[in-house]
Amino acid sequence: MSRRLKLNEEVRSLIRAAYLTQLRYGPFTAKEFNYATENDPLNHLVSSGYLLAQQSGPERRYSLSETGRSLIKVVLAGGVYDVIHVGHLAALTEAKSLGDVLVVVVATDVTVETLKGRRPVLPEEDRRALVEGLKPVDIAILGYEDVGFGFDQILKEVAPNIVAFGYDQEKLERTVVEIIQRQDLKIEVVKLSRFRDEKYASSSSLKQRLSEELS
């Protein structure tokens, strides 16, 4: 492996970490940038033009520059994830393969109740934490309390290069495509593959099977 390729991979990894830190905190401090390295990566990223730095009181805060952000591809996916199953894992694994960072927006309890007419089995923070614990997922965030997950605001915050939808998310896909077209955003929309085993393709079918087994 050439030194040039290795350096690019190291820089890309630092930029991924900076993007995720900024998504969590907004402009962030060195303390919030939790990246294990013996060197001072933030100053290197600033001097290379990948990060912007500004003094905010006693602390210096950092944010990605357009140049830095352009070096990574961010994928956004979303769903309810009320009882995670292998179909979710397959879809999120495919979504992650499309880019460098996978951000997943999880529907709030209010959104689920509005969409499905019932409260979810698991509360929103539990569902968010479970999704974030999946290997393909870099970060999971809660949506906003409307039937469209608040995707107009989420697209601004996440600024994805790609939005990936499951085979059964046609309504949500139409909503997001309308937002993208209305705001003239440069975002690619991708339809993920249908999971091969119908028995485990949806949370509702899985819950039905569990109910039958327990009855």
Regions found by a protein language model. Give the residues of each.
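Nucleotidyltransferase catalytic core that binds NTPs
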Residues: 2-215
